[in-house]
Amino acid sequence: MPKQDSLWLKSLRWIQKYLVHTIVVPQDPFADLNLDASRPLAYVMKTESLSDIAALSEITAKLGLPSPYEPLVVNGVVAPRVVCLEGRKPLFGDRASNEPFLECFMRLLAVHKEKPELDIQLVPVSLYWGRTPGKEDDTMKAAVLERENPTWLRKCLMILFLGRHNFVQFSNAVSLRYMADEHGTDMGIAHKLARVARVHFRRQRKVMTGPVLPNRQALFDSLLKSESLRKAIQEEAASKKISETQARETAIEYLDEIAANYSDSLVRIAERFLTWLWNKLYSGINIKGAEQIRQLHHDGHEIVYVPCHRSHMDYLLLSYILYYQGMVPPHIAAGINLNFWPAGPLFRRGGAFFIRRSFNGNKLYTAVFREYLDQLFAKGYSVEYFSEGGRSRTGRLLAPKTGMIAMTINSVLRGIERPVTLVPVYLGYDHVMEVATYHKELSGKKKQKESVWQVFGAIRKLGNFGQGYVNFGEPITLQNFLNETAPNWRSEVADDPEQKPTWLTPAVNVLANRVMTRINDAAAASSITLTSLVLLASEQNALERCLLERQLDLYLTLLKRVPYTSFTSVAEGDGKHLVQQGLELNKFSISADPLGEIVSIDDKQAISMTYYRNNIIHLFIIPSLIASCLINNKQISRAQIFGVVNDFYPLLKAELFMGIKDLPSYVDQVLDLFIEQGLVEETELLSVATERASQMLLLAGSVNETLQRYAIIFNLLAHRPKMERSDLESESHLLAQRLGALHGITAPEFYDKKLYNTLSVKLKELGYFSGKEDKSDVERIREQANNLLRASVRQTIVASVTAEQSFNG
């Protein structure tokens, strides 16, 4: 390797300074890969390349890592800092052998044998000039810009044309101490490490670039030759009494409507545009859990991203983040309503494939779509779809639509060899552009059809939107899920591939709910969501600034000390910092008088802020319920509190997609924290500390509207234990409207008919519609709900139910 200060290297670095823009994956190797700055470190690269090492040198200088030009000196032994598996490839002839790598590695192992306390970190580094996967028929371009083993001339062309899209990826370090202790220090282990490293770099390239892209027409021809689609075309021709040629033409039209037309050139242009857009809109995008997804890709999993759906921004945000995290943007299932000019063609070339809202019993369309989805899985393309089916208008997760999940499971049943893994993704924003529109729709205004004019209107409103949040939840590998749900699924499918298993529909429903639960498990508690939660629980949606900051400090402590799950993320900073962030985003108003500052939510914005509160209300609903038990009882035992929580939890779980694994332990941990923080005093019983009652009252306020809904339902059931589900839904909704009008409840979800349907389904599952005469469970829960309400609200509910009963009687 030439010396760092040689004229040749100086010239190369000067040229690359202007031609090359490098993106580092992960962005902070020290934090994300647990590198130890106190231990010696060497880099492993696949191929020796002066331009690659020059690019690496620029990055290591910025990150505070050792320069690749500095030799590694340990125990008197001098070794190169960069160890390459293969030598440089000349313009003609073969590249050098890997003997230098083996010799260098043997020297480092020998030093470990002599010095037991030594532990060198061996960090694999991959460099990519552009990320085009290539096409199946792209022979000319591959010849010019061949990326895996380019000659120096090809490398010059790559730097010239693709230098602005250079990626440097660091991988988890290998401990040479571990290798020496576990496997010895002979030449055999050196050869083994070389083989493992080659496999690693090959897999890493596949993760970064993805599989080759098919020619669209060749893909259509391949799909039309599949047995299932040929059969569907024949059935279409027979049922519609048309020729098979006509039915085939219809199938081609469906394919053309559905299929993506991925373009790497468009993705590169979009990356620049989106970088500008995110920098204009957001002060930062917070990401959690990307490393585990990279590892799944590296291990050969077929990845299906299942994010929640807040905004049309979701389509762009997740793809952008994955691209910058060193993964290929997925093929995205988009609603056919987005297939309008010019967005439709652009989305399609960005990887979107379009799906109709309803298949309406169209067997040919169903067969075409299923076959296309199977092909995406078979070829190794990652896929993304929104299981909610549409954007949430209230900020809560919607009940899942199971169609795409069912098709994914069916693809596994039809014999995909690789593990297929669903990755739940929580997407959150400090500002959702469509919130005002959502509330108009909830109040009865007809949804506007998507068009180019809406796009221009949205662009006109671009401003400071705060921060975005992308949290990857706990993955679900479908083969493991099927083994757990139906242990004999492989043999059942093998015996009768055409027969739909009896367990399939229940399994799909369980899986869909598990996905939604794991999305909520990965929620992001931000300054806006937390501050909204506090202020909306206060009287008049206003608090003294110092009290608001103190309450936020309590919530931050609760989330950090008693974490909801390990996948949840919590805002950095203290209560004071969070309030300031919200004020800078103009989400809250501030006024001052001689006694201090007051932070409030403007009446016009109160409904909008419920959207952000609802993003995280599930994180606080149990602590809030516990606080309500304590506030409404002078003294109460732990057992009594757990009894109340245990009675309400099945409904909360169904409504809010909660997944607390050990409820008794969680309740105890929350109570212990309350005691430690001086909020609660414990003798034989528990009671609220008088001087901290205001904080507990605020916390209890977050569950009030939920308890009011449950009080309506259980008061109705207590009066009419044999009432039908449909009657309970309609009458609960009617009474909720009355209660809201009398007590000023404005939260949109309070009047959401779908929510009462969700609750009635769960009540049926729990046996409340069995018609049995024993009403003890209903009476107990009714009594619990009533006792946790303000007297005026309780009186309204009881009186309204009695009046309704008299009217129906």
Swiss-Prot record:
EC number per UniProt: 2.3.1.15
Database matches in InterPro entries: GPAT/DHAPAT (IPR022284), GPAT/DHAPAT_C (IPR045520), GPAT/DHAPAT_LPLAT (IPR041728), GPAT_PlsB (IPR028354), Plipid/glycerol_acylTrfase (IPR002123)
Family annotation (SUPFAM superfamilies): Glycerol-3-phosphate (1)-acyltransferase
Compartment annotation: Cell inner membrane
GO molecular function, one term: glycerol-3-phosphate O-acyltransferase activity
GO cellular component assignments: plasma membrane
Domain of life: Bacteria
Cell inner membrane is among the record's keywords: yes
Pfam families to which the protein is assigned, alphabetical: Acyltransferase, GPAT_C
Domain notes: The HXXXXD motif is essential for acyltransferase activity and may constitute the binding site for the phosphate moiety of the glycerol-3-phosphate.
Name listed for the protein in its UniProt record: Glycerol-3-phosphate acyltransferase
Species annotation: Shewanella oneidensis (strain ATCC 700550 / JCM 31522 / CIP 106686 / LMG 19005 / NCIMB 14063 / MR-1)
Gene: plsB
